[in-house]
Amino acid sequence: GDFRSGYYRDQTFMMAIGELNVQQYFAALYAHTDTEHEPASGGRQMGGHYSTRSLNNDGTWKNLTEKKNSSADISPTAGQMPRLLGLAQASKLFRNNENLHSFTQFSNKGNEIAIGTIGDASTSEGLFWETMNAAGVLQVPMLMNVWDDGYGISVPKKFQTTKESISEALKGFQRNEKQKGYEIFNVKGWDYAALCDTYARAAAICRKEHIPVL
């Protein structure tokens, strides 16, 4: 199934996919230890750290292809990036290795994508650049989203991002007719119609062609 590997402010994302509601949000805020009320971690994680459960209560695997999956968020900025790469690589293995096609509770023959989220300030971290380069080399279905609000806490991006735009800085990663690479999109966060159209196109390319998309 599709997996998210994100950072610790994706409550809107999780609510949009139906994996978080208001009651669970406040249960996590007050560290509720009952997983019926706080399924992400039973109160063990900090606020804003989300995940979904891959196992049933009896320890058996859930069918991950029938649900929206999220790996557990962590606090170190850009720490989600190496895991994102691994999730995308797993999908490629499931597509290319016929011996794995029988594991239908995990993958539909590699028809999955790994969805990453990160803030623009954290793109200055080394783990971001290492992962982006590796995904381009490996050509894995990784859909990378950078939330660009212009600041990292209180530091404007002109002091931390070349050209003040991560998509501009990564233009050399754009694929062409002769060389493999990324498909890169840039869209205004306030333009909802354009967002829907861009994400539909980006996800379709990532899933069908099994290439990384920014």
What is each PLM-predicted segment?
Residues 142-214:
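Thiamine diphosphate
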Residues 1-140, 145, 156-174, 179:
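Cofactor-binding active-site loop characterized by glycine-rich and histidine/acidic residues
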